[in-house]
């Protein structure tokens, strides 16, 4: 399932490029760093979600479902998912911490010739104010359910960003080691307080880029209850 890895000639131990081929034969090139934390590499969930966005079941007939839609990616890291959306016609904001902005901007620059919508990078720390961000049509997130201490800030940001029509597409790898199962359980327990969600069946994922332990979930903010 893994996309190809293309080493950088200058220092392959320090940086390397992951190559992701699109259905139209063009190629996204994603710079990664061998050190610098979890945000500096392309995780499998990001590949699975990126390829899902290209599936006929998601894209629909005629213009792509993301064409001219506003998209915000949370925890973008390398920007893989957001860049895929931008090549499909979406107007995208990829977000992550300050220390990942240079990597995001580098990957935007490397792939700008493929973008048919628009894409820009912004700093966003989960749980903090989102003054300059509007509710998008779609929020995309891949492998963001990772650290227990980030769950509540992440959920606050999802609530703050979500409008009544916002569709959140969350892709995550189900991990069985250590505290991962209880972190995942806590996330969905907290999520259901304010959101409805449904899992997309595996047979709706990309035929090649799929795995039984990687899940795609659609999430929407609950409708307000009418006054009694």
From Swiss-Prot:
| A GO molecular function held by the record | protein-lysine N-methyltransferase activity
Result of knocking out the encoding gene: Deficient mice are viable, fertile and have no obvious pathological phenotype.
- Residues that bind S-adenosyl-L-methionine: 43, 75-77, 96, 126, 142, 147
Question: Could you name the Gene Ontology cellular component terms for this entry?
Answer: cytoplasm; cytosol; protein-containing complex
The UniProt keyword set, sorted, is: Acetylation, Cytoplasm, Methyltransferase, S-adenosyl-L-methionine, Transferase
Family annotation (Pfam families): Methyltransf_16
Q: Which residues carry this modification: N-acetylalanine?
A: 2
Top-level taxon of origin = Eukaryota
EC category: transferase
Instruction: Kindly list the places in or outside the cell where this protein is found, as annotated in its UniProt entry.
Output: Cytoplasm
Major localisation:
cytoplasm
Disulfide pattern: none
Q: In which tissues is it expressed?
A: Widely expressed.
Q: Which reaction does it catalyse?
A: L-lysyl-[protein] + 3 S-adenosyl-L-methionine = N(6),N(6),N(6)-trimethyl-L-lysyl-[protein] + 3 S-adenosyl-L-homocysteine + 3 H(+)
InterPro entries reported in the protein's UniProt record: Methyltransf_16 (IPR019410), SAM-dependent_MTases_sf (IPR029063)
The EC code for this enzyme is: 2.1.1.-
List, in alphabetical order, the GO biological process terms annotated in this UniProt record: peptidyl-lysine trimethylation
Describe the subunit structure. Answer: Interacts with ALKBH6. Interacts with ASPSCR1 and UBXN6; interaction with ASPSCR1, but not with UBXN6, enhances VCP methylation.
Q: Which family does it belong to?
A: Belongs to the methyltransferase superfamily. METTL21 family.
Q: What does this protein do?
A: Protein N-lysine methyltransferase that specifically trimethylates 'Lys-315' of VCP/p97; this modification may decrease VCP ATPase activity.
Name of the featured protein: Protein N-lysine methyltransferase METTL21D
């Amino acid at each position: 399932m893994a996309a190809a890895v293309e080493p950088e000639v200058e220092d392959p131990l320090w940086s390397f490029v992951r190559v992701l081929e699109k259905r139209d034969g063009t190629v996204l090139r994603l710079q990664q760093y061998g050190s610098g934390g979890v945000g500096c590499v392309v995780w499998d969930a990001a590949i699975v979600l990126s390829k899902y966005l290209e599936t006929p079941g998601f894209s629909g007939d005629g213009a792509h479902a993301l064409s001219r839609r506003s998209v915000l990616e949370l925890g973008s890291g390398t920007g893989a998912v957001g860049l895929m959306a931008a090549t499909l016609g979406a107007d995208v904001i990829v977000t992550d911490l300050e220390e990942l902005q240079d990597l995001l901007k580098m990957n935007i620059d490397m792939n700008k010739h493929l973008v048919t919508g628009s894409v820009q990078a912004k700093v966003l720390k989960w749980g903090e104010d989102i003054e300059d961000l509007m509710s998008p049509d779609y929020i995309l997130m891949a492998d963001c359910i990772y650290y227990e201490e980030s769950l509540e800030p992440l959920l606050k940001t999802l609530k703050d960003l979500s409008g009544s029509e916002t569709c959140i597409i969350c892709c995550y790898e189900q991990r069985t080691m250590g505290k991962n199962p209880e972190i995942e359980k806590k996330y969905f327990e907290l999520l259901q307080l304010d959101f409805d969600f449904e899992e997309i069946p595996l047979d709706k994922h990309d035929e090649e880029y799929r795995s039984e332990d990687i899940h795609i979930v659609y999430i929407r903010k609950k409708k307000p209850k009418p006054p009694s």
